[in-house]
Amino acid sequence: VILDVRHQDDFSKGHIPQSIFIGIDGDFAPWVGSLILDIKQPILLVTPVGREEESITRLARVGYDNTLGYLKGGFESWKNEGKEYDTVNWVTADTLEELMAEKVPVFDVRKEGEYAAEHIEGVPSTPLNSINDHIEEFPKEEEFYVHCAGGYRSVIAASILKARGYHNIINAIGGFTSIKKTAIKTTNYVCPSTLKS
């Protein structure tokens, strides 16, 4: 697997096709453990320049010690050599608000507890940690939109779905935090401590 650990904005602007994003400056270890199930999985890294060794060490600390190497010179060297690269399309929360009037498909990849506390009305819960169980729910042809709380997990979801051939995915940047500032209808907030587990 090609694992890209740069910032989600950098990954969105350009990445090696079929690479998976899990940013080193987010909840890196938990998401690696959750999404790369085989700890013996060979890994090729794309890192921010100068953070190659840190990335290898942090993977090894959680048991992933089969890192084959990293892209020398980072993603820019790949791009500068004229090699093919992919991007993640995105919209702002304000644009999503306009699109919601057209009943576009939107998916919430936050944890079930976050979704239960508050979510966009009519939008299904497809949590990132079980995204493989929801693959069939995503449209094959029609453009669809994903969001999380702030924009990190939705890019992970986009990378997984793009690697599986879903190039019609669009990320809502800023996530639910930005969506809350629009007129998009959300459910009434329920304090997570009052939710039954």
Question: Residue spans of the language-model regions?
Answer:
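Phosphate-rich cofactor/ligand-interacting catalytic cores and adjacent structured alpha/beta frameworks
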Residues: 4
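Hard-cation-handling environments
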Residues: 1
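Rhodanese-like catalytic fold shared by cysteine-dependent sulfurtransferases
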Residues: 8-197
